[in-house]
Every structure is written in structure tokens, then in C-alpha cells.
Amino acid sequence: MTELVTDGLSYWARQAPGRTAIVFDGADRTDYAALDRWTHAAAHFHVAAGLRPGDRVGIIGDNSLEWVVAAIGALKLGAIVVPFNNRFTQDELRYLVDDSGPRMVLADEAHRDRLASALARPPAADQDVTLLPLGAFTSLRGEHTAPMPRPQAGPDDVTQIVYTSGTSSRPKGVLFTHRSTFNLIADFAFAEPALRPAARMIYVLSMSGAPGLLWHILHPLTRGLSIFYERGFEPARTLRRLAEEKIQIMAGVPLLFEQMARLPEFAAADLSSLELVTIAGARAPVPVIRSWLDKGVLLRQAYGMTELGGISSLNPTDQAVDRPESIGRGTVFTRHRVVRPDGTDCDAEEPGEIIVSGPGVTPGYWRNEAAYAEAMRDGWFHSGDVGIKDADGYIRMVDRLKDVIITGGYNVAPSEIEAVISELPQVAEVCVVSAPDTKFGEVPAAVICADGALTAEAVTALCRERLAGYKVPRHVIIQDHPLERMASGKIARRKIRDAHPELAHAAQPVG
């Protein structure tokens, strides 16, 4: 009999029925037994609506208990869950529908009209999509229905299709199976003792993102944790929740931790309960790491991408102080290398591409074998990320290969410049992009969100002091509004560059 990704929930419903499974927005609590019953009722609802094992079901909506219940209910009957990113445009949503071919899409009220408009366009061949409200699952709470019969599933049957953000091409549907999901959970169960039954985890990012369903729904429920979901991220509320609920585990992007650290109440907040705090999605600025370290909280840099299950390596606790930028050396079963274009291993401190091999790496892309063959070569997934391995084998990520700026024959990593500029106290966000240059081919340009006290001269003066001359931004643009982000929450480097055509005309020249 194949172990299913929902078996963990059912186990804890028997083993610890009264243990809190989920606390939503600080008030709405449900225990494991109640959640198991609710998701069985959801599975029967799906069947009555026409969903069958192997069918795809799209889900779009803000964080909610109904989102969780609808997803687990679909998995219990053997359907494939396809999270639709809340921030995708109408055209992007239409692409997801056409590519994934769902039989059904569930939407909350906030996203229903946009999705309905996307579905109103001429459908793909033989495509008939039913649109249902996520709110329909609210009334199923408390129902006592018969458990959903186990589907006839194999270990390599697909359970989820999670789409990438589409930074350089159309979003790709990353596949997860029962086997790959359990491999990821087991890998980190060996490595991280904080991921233990009854531990208290908080999640403030979108459930529709790459880490949502796998890392912050299925993973904690399989391990018997108690999860505190927030409707969204609000710095003061999240900081208060960390302290009041004695949260032990949290993961987020650098911006979350930076915004909380800037709060006046941060200094007095009791965060002593935190045991495992991971920061991912981008390189964390060292000043942010230090601000939390001053409170005794180790921010541990993680590395991963959708194709790697969200996280494939995590800086060990004993390295978080001495090597704050390290992403670690891999996990128990997952290996990482840094290689040259010819596939040979780089020497220590030599930049190269990070490649990954492990049991949790995606087994493929949905309907895109060519892209998978290009990425997965000789058993190693080629990430497209530039990394550097030190003499002890610890890796630090430098940048995306495609983001590296080649100026006058020299390679420049935008993240290196961004790390320096981020040290200026007036800087809220910074993105370094390439700008065309007649002499050097391309040069670095910095687009900064900062308060009015910051000047381009201050930026370039610091960069001249800290960086080689060819790394100093030749253009500096300062704005008072946040930088544009992708649906995943990462800074949208390409969109920011395209939004500033003046960069080609020396908007803020630097000698």
C-alpha cells in the first residue's frame, strides 16, 4: 500500500486528536481530529462536484482555513492540486488554466471575478472547467462524514503542480509526487530537531507560493506540528504573535525580517522561544541578520527553488554567526556542487553554477520534457544560480547566472553591490540591474527605494570605498515607493529594468 501525503494528518488525528493543528489569524483554532473530519467532508464535496482521481484542481485565494481544507480534501481522493498564484495577472491565470487543464478551479471572493474573466476567453481544446467558490467549504466544518476511501495511488503519482514565477519565460509546472514529498520531509526530519511534534510554527506568506502547500501545510501536518497561519504579513502583528504565542519556527523572505527589525517595539520583544528561523527567497543582507542576532535569534540562510521542493540546503546553527551568508553544505540526502560550464568542480572561492542531486528534486515539469531535460543532466539539477564554495565546503549564493553583469569583460554580481548599498540606513530596498554602455557593453545601475535624505552621491561614495571601480553603479535612481515584486514576492529585476528606460541615457552618471 502506497503511503499518501495526507496520511500524516490522519495519523495525528488518531494519535493526538485534541492537539491544535491550525490557528488562523490568532483566533480560529482547529485540532487534528476536527481537521481530519473537515478534509474528509471536503473530499466528498469534490467527488460530488465531479472531481476524480488524477484530475487537476486549481485553487486561488487569500490564506484561509478553507484553502487548506480544499487542498487536502482533493489530495485525499487522489486529485492533483494546482495552486494559482494570487498575484498573477488575468493572462497569466489563463495560461495556468490552459497548461494544467484543471477540471475544477476554486476561488475566493477576492479573486473570483478575475479568474472568471480569464476563463471567459475561448478555452483550450476539449477543456471544460468548473468554477466553484472556496467559501463552499466553510459549511462543511463540523460534518461527520465517512472517511474518503483511499485512492489506488502509486508512490510516483503526481500530487501537486506548483508553477514557477516565470522570471525569464512562461511559468513551468513543477511536479511533486507522494515519494518526492516524503523524501523532502524525511530529509529535514533528520537534520532539524526543531521540526518535532507539537512544535509551534508560523506562516505569513501566501499559501499559493512555492513553499505554501508542501512546506507549510503538508510538511508540518505530517510531523504533527501546530501551525499559526496569518491572513497576510503585517510587521507589528507578526512580531506580537511571535512573542505572545511563543512561536518556535518561522520562515520568510529577507524583507519580512527587515521590516520587523525596524519596529520600535522590536528591541523589547521577547523572541526567546524561536528555535528555527530560516530566511530564503533572496540573499539576506548581513545587517538584517545581525539585528536579529543581537536579540539572540539566529537567522539561518536557506537555499532552494520550486524545483528543489522549496529548500534544499540550510546554514547549520553553528555556522550562522561566523558564516551568516552561507547556505550550508546540503542536507542528509541532498548534495550540492559548484561547477564550471564544462561540468568540472570549481576550486574553493571560484564562482560557478550550483547543481543539486537528491531524492526530493522534482521528477519533472508538467508537459515540458524539453525544459526538464535541459535542467536535469546526469542526475544533477542545474539551478542557474551562481555560487561559491569555500575551503570547508560551505556554499554562499552569489546571483542568478542570467543576472550577472558583464562590464568590460569583468563579471559583476548584482547581489554584491546590493549588499553594500543596503548598509546605508536610509535604504529600504535596492535592486541592481544592467544598463547598456557604449564603452563597456553594460554597466551596473542601482534602483533604490529610500527616504528623501539619501543622495546618489552618498551611494556611490560608499560603493567606491567598498568595491572595485568597475562594480560601482554608473546610474543611481532613488524613489520613494517600493520596488516591484514578482508573484513569488521576490524583487522583479527584469520589470524594474524595463520600467526605467532612462538608464540607457545616464540618468545619474557616475564617473
Question: What does each model-identified segment do?
Answer:
Residues D31-A34, T159-A186:
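Conserved AMP-binding A3 loop
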Residues A468-K490, Q508-V510:
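AMP-binding/adenylate-forming catalytic domain of the ANL superfamily
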Residues T2, P17-G18, T145-Y163, S169-R170, ...:
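Conserved pre-ATP/AMP-binding loop-to-beta segment of ANL
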Residues A48-A49, K76-R141, A450-L454, Q479:
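Structural core segment of the AMP-binding/adenylate-forming
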Residues S10, G18-S64, V68, I72, ...:
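Conserved AMP-binding/adenylate-forming core of the ANL superfamily
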Residues F182-R200, S208-I249, L263:
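Conserved AMP-binding/adenylation subdomain of ANL enzymes
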Residues T222, I247-G252, A261-D322, R335:
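Gly/Ser/Thr-rich phosphate-binding loop
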Residues F88, V105, L242, M250, ...:
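AMP-binding/adenylate-forming catalytic core of the ANL superfamily
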